[in-house]
């Protein structure tokens, strides 16, 4: 008899400070798929669910049970209708296909639904109540997961990414799927130890020297006999739940004591390194002065605080305003979220000028207020392109209806749907060659470095006003009680 593996994707990275909710509209803009369609759209795509399919669809002794593939761009709280529907569809699939032999969950690890504090933990608990405690539940996680006690209790194994930028999304999915495969084949019995490290880490790229010693220790532990995985998650501080922060997960083969021992070792190493895990950010004036100097290749300025990939609104005007005030030319900016301006550009038509009140529509304090500009409309597109870089390779990125305009010698991509523009195809698909620009401005914190590093002579990350400040000291927490 074939072994039945329930597979689903239900992802959200929740920034509770963002006023835009993770509702049905937000999910439909990105990914909102049911049943067989959830597999058909993820097959051959560089996601965790795509990795599950890659490993198990080759086997004729396994039946993969499709459920849902829900993904929305990071934003505010997930609304109850979305969360409840996802849980109901997963529950229905479990009941209809009972008995289930295993569950592979493609989740982020930092979901906060309205009225709840632990989206994934509550979901895993529901699944456990339905399938019991004897079958494996394994989940790859985002590096920025806030791993809670409930998540660790209800899951058999949790394996977060190792890289930021997240160039190892697919590899981590394969890792989790292969652990499940070995488990079902009787080659391994996963036992996991979990430690919570109550510290809020800034958005910290794993290429920085300060954090490299921790990955060296984790990989040394992972290479030891009896260990399958030794990982730590950075946490996602804008979620503002009681259990935000760093965490450690060590998975061994049927040896809980060994897992506990090595989890203690990795936790101690992290705590010893914490005083060094700090980042200083330059001012906007400093960044623009450096970027405006002549050099070979563009300078990339990343606006981390308006990163849609961390739940920001994507509409801030701080950097564009400063560029225009300083008379800088030759910059290309991706992106400003402003559906009304896109509609105005479409009405004017490509090849014509249009007066815009651009961006800054969410909140003058955070978004900078709208910019009154005269823009030359270069093109209108559907905002879709194929991601060609390593992060989410093969995914169709969708920014909604999009306008490309020239404002005083600077090119600006205006979109209708929020999405982090971490792939250079955001420019190329809109007629802009990134290598030929003096300055590239991107609404991203760290992910941009994976692809933009191919063309940049320098990359500068800023932490300005916005809903996704790069430094955890920038928030007024209501639920978090630990150390920053």
Predicted ranges, named:
Residues 203-408, 413-417:
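Hard-cation-handling environments
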Residues 66, 88, 271, 384-484:
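Extended hydrophobic packing segments that form well-structured cores
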Residues 2-58:
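N-terminal amphipathic/basic leader segments beginning at the initiator methionine
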Residues 1-2, 58-61, 66, 92-103, ...:
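Glycine-rich phosphate/diphosphate-binding loops that line cofactor/substrate pockets in enzymes
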Residues 57-61, 95-99, 129-132, 160-163, ...:
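Generic secondary-structure signature for well-ordered alpha-helical cores
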Residues 53-74, 78-82, 86-94:
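Low-complexity, highly charged intrinsically disordered N-terminal segments
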Residues 184-212:
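Internal, active-site/partner-interface "lid" segment
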Residues 6-13, 17-18, 27, 31, ...:
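Active-site histidine-anchored catalytic micro-motif
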């Amino acid at each position: 008899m074939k072994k039945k593996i329930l597979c689903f994707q239900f992802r959200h990275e929740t920034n509770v400070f963002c006023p835009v909710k993770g509702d049905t509209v937000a999910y439909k803009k990105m990914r909102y798929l049911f049943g067989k369609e959830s597999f058909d759209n993820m097959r051959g795509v560089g996601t965790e669910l795509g990795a599950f399919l890659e490993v198990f669809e080759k086997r004729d002794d396994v039946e993969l049970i499709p459920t849902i593939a829900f993904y929305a761009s990071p934003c505010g709280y997930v609304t109850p209708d979305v969360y409840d529907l996802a849980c109901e569809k997963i529950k229905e699939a479990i009941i209809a296909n009972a008995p289930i032999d295993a569950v592979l969950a493609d989740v982020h690890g930092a979901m906060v639904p309205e009225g709840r504090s632990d989206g994934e933990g509550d979901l895993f608990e529901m699944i456990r109540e339905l399938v019991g405690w004897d079958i494996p539940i394994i989940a790859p996680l985002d590096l920025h997961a806030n791993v809670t006690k409930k998540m660790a209790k209800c899951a058999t194994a949790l394996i977060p990414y190792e890289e930021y930028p997240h160039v190892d999304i697919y590899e981590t999915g394969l890792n989790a799927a292969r652990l499940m495969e070995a488990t079902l084949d009787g080659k391994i019995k996963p036992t996991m130890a979990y430690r919570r490290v109550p510290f809020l880490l800034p958005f910290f790229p794993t290429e920085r020297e300060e954090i490299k010693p921790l990955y060296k220790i984790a990989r040394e532990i992972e290479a030891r006999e009896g260990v399958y995985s030794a990982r730590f998650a950075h946490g996602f501080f804008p979620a503002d739940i009681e259990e935000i922060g760093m965490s450690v997960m060590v998975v061994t083969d049927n040896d809980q004591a060994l897992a506990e021992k090595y989890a203690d070792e990795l936790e101690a190493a992290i705590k010893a390194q914490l005083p060094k895990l700090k980042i200083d950010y330059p001012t906007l004036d400093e960044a623009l002065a450096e970027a405006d100097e002549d050099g070979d290749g563009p300078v990339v300025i990343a606006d981390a605080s308006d990163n849609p990939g961390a739940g920001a609104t994507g509409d801030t005007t701080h950097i564009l305003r400063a560029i225009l005030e300083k008379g800088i030319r030759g910059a290309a900016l991706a992106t400003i979220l402003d559906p009304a301006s896109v509609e105005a550009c479409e009405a004017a038509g490509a090849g014509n000028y249009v007066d815009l009140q651009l961006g800054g529509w969410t909140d003058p304090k955070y978004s900078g207020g709208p910019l009154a500009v005269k823009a030359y409309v270069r093109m209108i597109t559907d905002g879709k392109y194929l991601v060609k870089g390593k992060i989410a390779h093969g995914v169709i990125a969708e920014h909604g209806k999009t306008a490309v305009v020239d404002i005083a010698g600077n090119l600006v991509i205006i979109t209708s749907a929020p999405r982090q523009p971490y792939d250079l195809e955001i420019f190329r698909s809109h007629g802009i060659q990134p290598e030929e620009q003096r300055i590239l401005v991107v609404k991203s914190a760290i992910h941009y470095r994976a692809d933009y590093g191919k063309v940049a002579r320098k990359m500068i990350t800023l932490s300005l006003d916005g809903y996704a400040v790069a430094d955890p000291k920038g928030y007024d927490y209501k639920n978090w009680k630990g150390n920053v």
